């Protein structure tokens, strides 16, 4: 399943149950463009995890809320609470490990 788009209006409702991997990104960010296909691949493979995207240029309030000061930033939110965060381009193997840690 493709990642969903989060805004300040739907963020809390979409992340309140289960594990959600939230990709804070921007259209002008080269590393973000390289991260996207990795996240898309994981989203297809891991059906028990929700994947979502937040455009930091359009959703500055969310970027501030999660203290995003570099992109890409990936936030791992379990049952509405931030449990892990990774900044920078991240490999598929590291993301898989972070997802498994965040599920526990």
Positions of predicted regions on the chain:
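N-terminal leader/targeting and pre-domain segments
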Residues: 1-18, 101-104
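Short acidic active-site motifs
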Residues: 10, 58-62, 94
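Short active-site neighborhood of thiol/selenol oxidoreductases, capturing the structured segment around
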Residues: 15-27
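Conserved helix-turn-beta segment immediately C-terminal to the redox Cys motif
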Residues: 18-19, 34-54, 58-60
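Structural micro-motif
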Residues: 20, 60, 66-75
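Conserved redox-active cysteine motifs that mediate thiol-disulfide chemistry
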Residues: 24-38
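Non-catalytic, surface beta->alpha helical segment in thiol-disulfide oxidoreductase systems
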Residues: 78-104
């Amino acid at each position: 399943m493709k990642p969903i788009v989060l805004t300040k209006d739907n963020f809390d409702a979409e992340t309140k149950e289960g594990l959600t991997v939230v990709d804070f990104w921007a259209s002008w960010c080269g590393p973000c463009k390289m991260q996207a296909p990795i996240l898309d691949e994981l989203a297809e493979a891991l059906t028990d995890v929700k994947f979502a995207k937040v455009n930091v240029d359009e959703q500055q309030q969310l970027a501030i809320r999660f203290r995003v000061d570099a992109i890409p930033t990936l936030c791992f939110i379990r049952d509405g609470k931030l449990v892990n965060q990774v900044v920078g381009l991240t490999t598929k193997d590291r993301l898989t490990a972070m997802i498994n840690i965040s599920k526990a």
